Amino acid sequence: MHKEIEESTNLQLDFSKLEKIQNNLKLTEVIPVAVQNSETKEVLLIAYVNKEALDYSIKNRIATFWSTSRNELWVKGKTSGDYLELIEIRVNCEQNSLLYLVKPKKGVCHTQDKDGNTRRTCFYRKINLLKKELKFI
């Protein structure tokens, strides 16, 4: 199912994501974190953090998140080697979301391009506004 979504040009947005998170979380609270390349300012991914993930990120200077699907700490790069060195953390005005400024060590997304390379961002498609279809960029 994930490949159908990740490699498709069909627009299939998951508007129920927050509801799934709410239903899946038992003992933890999370806030969203946008992750941006500190040098290029390119947005790399959107994830969630809880206190444990934030503390781990600060202590180890590696972008770390809370996996809302697995309900566990997600150290980005632990299995792939695609670590994100944490340069700075910013907090929004209402203190209910964060911005991680990072320096990627390799790729970022868990998906790969047609040549088998890890993508540099999870935002590798755009919506054709006329056709409401996705286009790889």
Describe the residue ranges of each PLM region:
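C-terminal binding/interaction regions
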Residues: H2-V30, N37-L44, V49-I137
